[in-house]
């Protein structure tokens, strides 16, 4: 019996084999005109274990599940690929702590590179930055005294590892809160020349009684400062439109473009907070959500930000 595929099914099958630029263009057409809701970017919390106890982070406090095996990790990565994911970010906890038998996070990255256009990793910077991911984010949340207050005396080691690394695509990611927001301009100036660029996000209140979340008035001051610094040539990677949109969250969130994997291997589709805390869209400060949503709306600046940060199509000889 001959089975005829619909135009939609044929398009979907062909997309699995496309190079990055054709895949993303076809992805856009499929989602816009066929009303598909296919995720594109996934964050994989490969472990909740961490060697630090950061003030703003709820994940290290959670009882770590049994370590997922390398075999399970490979199956999860394959599932993400089948779902349509083409950009992967490995997270924790501290992802460099993941280990199963002889396998380490380096092996996970090698497998992931065979499946995704771009593989990134977010780290606290206390381990050598020798991993061959396309992009490395190091969390830096203040100048030395402030960072150490938030991130348990890890500033010197993080900066040392950044400066020792030969990786060409290291970004600093700043989580902005009531402790550090007034020194963000000084931090940006300190980091300039040490990293490829700087991305930001605002602290999200996962816990009850949280006191670290900024008011929108404070947020606006920070964002205006970042816009001024970006105009002056400092390496703020987030787009102008993203920074402006975060002032009052006047952007249309496309959370269906996202997927999240928990340390136990379960997969959630949608908002980063889903299954991790109470979803409060009004106070969202995840600039990555903002940027990908703006890119879907065909804002060229946001599209170019994604291409620059994720280095689609780059080979490991480039790293």
Regions found by a protein language model. Name each.
Residues 1-5, 102-106, 115-118, 134, ...:
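Radical SAM enzyme [4Fe-4S]-AdoMet core and its adjacent flexible, acidic
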Residues 8-128, 132, 311-314, 319:
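Conserved alpha-helical substructure of the radical SAM core
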Residues 44, 48-51, 247, 275-278:
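Processing junctions and N-termini across compartments
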Residues 49-59, 255, 279-288:
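Local cysteine-cluster metal-coordination motifs and their immediate loop/turn environment
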Residues 60, 91, 139, 201, ...:
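Conserved residues at the C-terminal ends of beta-strands
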Residues 264-319:
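Flexible mid-to-C-terminal extensions adjoining Fe-S/redox cofactors in radical SAM and related proteins
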